[in-house]
From Swiss-Prot:
Pfam families: DBI_PRT (PF02277). It comes from Chloroflexus aggregans (strain MD-66 / DSM 9485). Its EC number is 2.4.2.21. One of its GO terms (biological process) is cobalamin biosynthetic process. This is Nicotinate-nucleotide--dimethylbenzimidazole phosphoribosyltransferase. Catalyzes the synthesis of alpha-ribazole-5'-phosphate from nicotinate mononucleotide (NAMN) and 5,6-dimethylbenzimidazole (DMB). Gene3D superfamilies: 1.10.1610.10, 3.40.50.10210. It catalyses: 5,6-dimethylbenzimidazole + nicotinate beta-D-ribonucleotide = alpha-ribazole 5'-phosphate + nicotinate + H(+). Belongs to the CobT family.
């Protein structure tokens, strides 16, 4: 049995008993019931995910998957492909936005080379799991084989398992890869059935002509390959990316281990859609970190029926929105765990009518 199949088979429902106990405790805390709004619901959700009435999230980490895309040769990005390895080195030096924000919230940054189209120097903080030097140009041929797509997902599962085995109890998804919004738009259009123009944005800031070219490239690719929207592996293989597959694996791995996983932006959203086609129950373990201004992100949340915690007009990726949302997950759990109940504090409860 493959690692992917084993992992999917281990994804079960939320723990209703833990969630019910958490809700009961929320109602006993020294505040009007519901007065902390979505923080209360978030803590109850995390209780159901972890199976603990009073979950404590003390070791967060963001897994940043990096890979290149053959479709970049079609002029769909404002930046050249060599930016991918350059940014990976920036991550390793601690100089990127994800590093700054992760330090702010106390999260570990795990950088994974799953498909960068360059040989990166060895570094103690680099997880080298390169499967290929980027994908093929999916405007001409499938992005990768079905076998390679499964390998990408299994790399992500392994990375999630390794992080959880080291004590990580809250995961977030992040990525780097020039032209990966093109692949993400293709994945989202294929799975949701939305028109390509409706789920395709400017990515790194392309002009009108480049946006029109990007849309046309994706439309032609979907006609050429006819990805099956009910088969996440087929969609990933035909129009996806190695880092998208890796992140789908991170999500599945977290779900199988009952660890909450905070979904970042548009590319992570595409990975979440792939994970959901493979294991619908995995959606229960996803927390939507933020709403990206990248146009297709709303379609992702509509399909998954998730409501993002933050809406800050961000569109960087890397996991930046997700790590900010991690602090809300931790805050929600701290309120549930550390606040006194009415009985403990000697505070009178609300009078019954």
């Amino acid at each position: 049995m493959s690692l992917l199949t084993q992992t999917i088979n281990h994804i079960g429902p939320l723990d209703d008993q833990a969630a019910t106990a958490a809700r009961r405790r929320q109602d006993m805390l020294t505040k009007p019931a519901g007065s902390l709004g979505r923080l209360e619901e978030l803590s109850i959700r995390i209780a159901g995910i972890t199976g603990r009435e009073r979950p404590r999230l003390t070791k967060p980490a963001v897994i940043v998957m990096a890979a290149d895309h053959g479709v970049a040769r079609q002029g769909v990005s404002a930046f050249p492909a060599e930016v991918t390895p350059q940014m990976v080195l920036n991550f390793l030096r601690g100089g990127a936005a994800i590093n700054v924000l992760a330090r702010h919230v106390g999260a570990q940054v795990i950088v994974v080379d799953i498909g960068v189209a360059a040989d990166l120097p060895s570094h103690p903080e680099l997880v080298s799991r390169k499967l290929a030097y980027g994908t093929a140009d999916f405007s001409q041929e499938p992005a990768m084989s079905r076998d390679l797509a499964q390998q990408a997902i299994e790399v992500g599962i392994t990375c999630a398992n390794e992080a959880i085995d080291s004590g990580v109890d809250l995961l977030a998804t992040g990525e780097m890869g020039i032209a990966n919004t093109t692949a993400a738009s293709a994945v989202v259009a294929a799975i949701t059935g939305r028109p390509v123009a409706e789920v395709t944005g400017r990515g790194t800031g392309i002009d009108d002509a480049s946006l029109a070219r990007k849309i046309a490239v994706i439309e032609r690719a979907l006609v050429l390959h006819q990805p099956n929207p009910r088969d996440g592996l087929d969609v990933l293989a035909k129009v996806g990316g190695l880092e998208i597959g890796g992140l789908a694996g991170v999500i599945l791995g977290a779900a199988a281990r009952r660890v909450p996983v905070v979904i970042d932006g548009f590319i992570s959203g595409a990975a979440a859609l792939i994970a959901a086609t493979l294991a619908p129950a995995a959606v229960n373990y996803m927390i939507a970190g933020h709403r990206s201004v990248e146009r297709g992100h709303a379609a992702v949340f509509d399909r998954l029926d998730l409501k993002p915690l933050l809406d800050l007009d961000m569109r960087l990726g890397e996991g930046t929105g997700a790590v900010l949302a991690m602090s809300l997950c931790q805050a929600a759990c701290k309120v549930l765990d550390e606040m006194a109940t009415f009985a403990e504090a000697g505070v009178s409860e609300k009078k019954e009518a």
